[in-house]
Design a protein with these regions (language model features):
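Rossmann-like AdoMet/SAM-dependent catalytic core
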Residues: 3-56, 68, 107-109, 154-248
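SAM cofactor-binding core of SAM-dependent methyltransferases
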Residues: 25-115, 119-122, 126, 149-152
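A short helix->loop->beta-strand "cap" motif at the edges of active sites that frequently abuts
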Residues: 76-78, 139-141, 192
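A structural signal for short, well-ordered beta-strand segments and their strand-loop junctions
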Residues: 82, 121, 142-146, 193-199, ...
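Secondary-structure boundary elements
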Residues: 114, 137-139, 189
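Short helix-to-loop capping/linker segments positioned immediately adjacent to catalytic or ligand/cofactor-binding
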Residues: 117, 131-132, 191-195
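A short alpha/beta connector and helix-capping loop motif
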Residues: 130-168
Length: 248
């Protein structure tokens, strides 16, 4: 596997795209997040504006460890819904809910999530693609997802939808989630642009295109690819028994 650096498009938009990237990289900082998301999110909301200081995050663990929303909640006056399917949820700060494509919008309604929430963070190590796809009546300004890095950049793949899926990180650690290309295709269809990926963590941040400042130029999504795999020895990750990868 080869690490990829700045792979910016060599056209007349290079300067603007590079400026966007350099600005976010300069603001990357972790207070509670895993790989700089705290600082990047603050900078993004400085640029696109905030409506209600509202968020939803699942799976949220204990609401603080590697959380993409804890800094906003604890230090910047935001409020929102935290959900986690495991026993890490305390039932008060973090609601114990198993989120899937069938129940995600019902859960949003149950807990009074505003339709125009500011931030949605998805990290459930499984049906992430399908759950975001199922969110049709809510329109977050920014969406953070964890993607599967073990695909070549052009491969748009996700696990087959299975509401009972549980990540087997010991026996089949690579069978989870969806590739960056898959999320980018889904995001484009929903009206989002890829605004950032973490240099060392498999997290991607998407912003609604209509919320971007007028005239801003974002790098092409391929410029955000942080990992690459040689064609000579590449093998698609092995699915667990009964599972399969789906091209999207």
């Amino acid at each position: 596997m080869e690490r990829r650096g700045s792979n910016l498009p060599s056209d007349s938009l290079l300067e603007g795209a590079a400026a966007w990237r350099e600005d976010l990289e300069a603001h990357a900082e972790s207070v509670h997040s895993q790989g700089g998301e705290d600082g990047v999110l603050l900078r993004l909301f400085e640029r696109i504006g905030v409506r209600s200081r509202s968020f939803v995050e699942f799976g949220a663990w204990d609401g603080e460890h590697w959380s993409n929303t804890a800094n906003l909640r604890l230090n910047h006056g935001w409020q929102g819904l935290l959900m986690e399917g495991s026993d890490r949820a305390d039932g008060q700060l973090v609601r114990r809910e198993r989120v899937d494509a069938e129940n995600v919008e019902a859960l949003f309604a149950k807990y009074g999530v505003p339709q125009d929430l500011d931030l949605l963070s998805i990290d459930i190590d499984g049906n992430d693609y399908w759950v975001w796809d199922a969110i049709r009546n809510y329109c977050p300004a920014v969406v953070v997802v964890e993607y599967n890095v073990f695909f070549r950049p052009e491969m748009a793949r996700t696990i087959e939808y299975d509401p009972a899926h549980a990540w087997d990180k010991d026996e089949y650690p690579l069978y989870h989630g969806a590739s960056l290309a898959a999320f980018c295709k889904l995001a484009e269809g929903k009206g989002y642009r890829l605004a950032w990926t973490e240099p060392w963590c498999p997290n991607a941040i998407f912003v609604r295109a209509e919320r971007l400042p007028r005239g801003v130029v974002l790098p092409d999504w391929r410029a955000w690819t942080r990992w690459d795999w040689s064609l000579d020895d590449y093998r698609e990750p092995t699915p667990r028994p009964g599972g399969r990868w789906v091209a999207v």
